[in-house]
Amino acid sequence: MRGCLQLARWLSAAPKGTAASLTRAPFVLANAPRYFTSSASRAGSRSTATKPLSDLEKRISAIPIERYRNFCIVAHVDHGKSTLSDRLLELTGTIEPGSNKQVLDKLDVERERGITVKAQTCSMIYNHNGEDYLLHLVDTPGHVDFRAEVSRSYASCGGALLLVDASQGIQAQTVANFYLAFAQGLELIPVINKVDLPSAEPERALEQMKNSFELDTENAVMVSAKTGLNVEKLLPTVIEKIPAYGHFPVDSHELLPLLTLSSPIGDCKKPLRMLLVDSWYDSYKGVICLVRIFDGEIRAGQQVVSFATGLKYYVGEAGIMYPNETPQSVLRAGQVGYIYFNPGMKRSKEAKIGDTFTRVGFEKAVEPLPGFEEPKAMVFVAAYPVDADHFEHLEDSINQLVLNDRSITVQKESSEALGAGFRLGFLGTLHCSVFEDRLRQEHGASIIITPPSVPVKIIWKDGKEEIITSPAKFPEDEELRSKVAEIQEPYVLATLTFPEEYLGKVIELCEANRGEQKSLEYFTPTQVILKYELPLAQLVDDFFGKLKGSTKGYASLDYEESAWQTGNIVKLQLLVNKAPVDAVARIVHSSQVERLGRQWVTKFKEHVDRQLFEVVIQAAVGKKIIARETVKPYRKDVLAKLHASDVSRRRKLLEKQKEGRKRLRAVGNVVIEHKAFQAFLAK
């Protein structure tokens, strides 16, 4: 009431016309979510009224598609991709120079770890020879676990800066990223970074690039992303070397070189054809989609339809990343930008990466784009809320993060020990670790994560094959003997690069992890490239940490899927008073059973409280006990009230206590707190 009186007094004192204009204007809450607006406000958002163009939008609208350049930066981890991106953004005036540090590393986990885990995009305007060019930059991850991000990024690009550290030279993921870019037909520009370091050897790095990749290094650019040395030479090279045409995204079934055209892909006069490249969740706007416009144009208020789901949406806002979300009145063919819908998507699963959108009514006139190849999850963990009441919160948090990372697989799972949870699939152990950090940092989720495991293939005697990702689905002993022909495990081809002096230690490590050597070559007199075929199960068991320890941190690792091979695979279980603890079971190779079994019983004993009866902790494979520990019971002194009684009376009381403990052990339930599992499963 007081607020109404104040508003009335203000209106009476305001100049003429103010009150009338205020009463005519619709009243909209400033903080109301845009995707839950009323029908009246939605109708207003679809009106054809246009706002005055900003100076930025006027410059962009004047640039023809022939002067668009889409490119990315690819390199090994820590070779300076994000720092170089900062310098390019400063050079084009997109951000203010000075205090910028990894502007495109927007996640907390990226800034903490100092690595890029999520491909980020940004549009820039650069004047070259008196003409404006619209440049679209993608900063890609370097680690092998995020290769799906890199592969999707290439679909938006016509070329790439191949970045190599002058002091380290070519590393394992430099090789992997080169071949991925080469296979997709990208124009590659060699760039040597960190030339200002005392240990820099740019000539050696150039020689490596020339010999390993057969690249023309005469026009390579020597830069220091940290100081900005020679960075101004990069963008003219990008404009001159990278073509204005782009690529269609990779076919969903075959990784073939992408279709390259002699003229720019994209025609503003054709019906809209828009590719969904990425998506993320905003608590205010809902699902935000990163899109590439192949044909036509898109504006706020227009209605579009998805080819994948058939669902229709009104566009609430369209814009570019500059480097943050910057609204524009229109996105045209050749541009990469963002959109969100009003009302928003009701379920996060509606945003399917690789989906094609067009204007409603033009479905038959537009051919959908092929989409992306779906990555296969190869590392699995189970995730449970610490408090069972927080299950729904954990489910919402996982769904929002999966919206931003579609390479993760999610299945609901239940455990007698830990309750309802999820089985999550990842591309690697770092991928899993980053997801766990994001759950805790961005959503405040308190979770219990089981150790990573890999899938196994069961070949039944009737000829059927089945992929098993959960220990709960692994066949029991009797079924193994009678119905299973063989069990196979996945192998990978690992590429390791390191100084020659550590060759003996690295070979010893690989052999100890059931590896088989495939090749050994020197790409310089002091640098070795070693290829080994390794079981994926050994790779996820902290193999990279052991490799770093053996080489004092100088080794790098990359790997790719190889084949399934027959192995002696078993299910290792933890038993507490002969009852299996399902949350701790793992599928392992028989060579790991004794080591893991002893570790389990020793560690689990530390976290089990004493009971009134004896608690027996065992590690077992089938009916065979591998290791055992015992938690002694509380001891009640039944002889305390006896003084000088006879020996037979004492013996009778002790025998009675012994019988009582046997009955307790037979019928009593061992109480194991959630915190015990949390401590046991902690790394």
From Swiss-Prot:
GO MF annotation, one: GTP binding
GO CC term (a single one): mitochondrial matrix
Transit peptide limits: 1-43
Stated name of the protein: Translation factor guf1, mitochondrial
Membrane topology listed for this record: Peripheral membrane protein
Catalytic activity, EC: 3.6.5.-
Pfam families the record matches: EFG_C, GTP_EFTU, LepA_C
Residues noted as binding GTP in the record, renumbered to the chain: 75-82, 139-143, 193-196
One biological process term in Gene Ontology: translation
CDD domains named in the record: EF4_II, LepA, lepA_C
Keyword set, alphabetical order: GTP-binding, Hydrolase, Membrane, Mitochondrion, Mitochondrion inner membrane, Nucleotide-binding, Protein biosynthesis, Transit peptide
Family: Belongs to the TRAFAC class translation factor GTPase superfamily. Classic translation factor GTPase family. LepA subfamily.
Enzyme class: hydrolase
Superkingdom to which the source organism belongs: Eukaryota
Reaction catalyzed: GTP + H2O = GDP + phosphate + H(+)
UniProt-annotated location(s): Mitochondrion inner membrane
Organism of provenance: Aspergillus fumigatus (strain CBS 144.89 / FGSC A1163 / CEA10) (Neosartorya fumigata)
PROSITE patterns, A to Z: G_TR_1, G_TR_2
Function: Promotes mitochondrial protein synthesis. May act as a fidelity factor of the translation reaction, by catalyzing a one-codon backward translocation of tRNAs on improperly translocated ribosomes. Binds to mitochondrial ribosomes in a GTP-dependent manner.
InterPro entries: EF-4 (IPR006297), EFG_III/V (IPR035647), EFG_V-like (IPR000640), G_TR_CS (IPR031157), LepA_C_sf (IPR038363), LepA_CTD (IPR013842), LepA_IV (IPR035654), P-loop_NTPase (IPR027417)
Ranges where the tr-type G domain occurs: 66-250
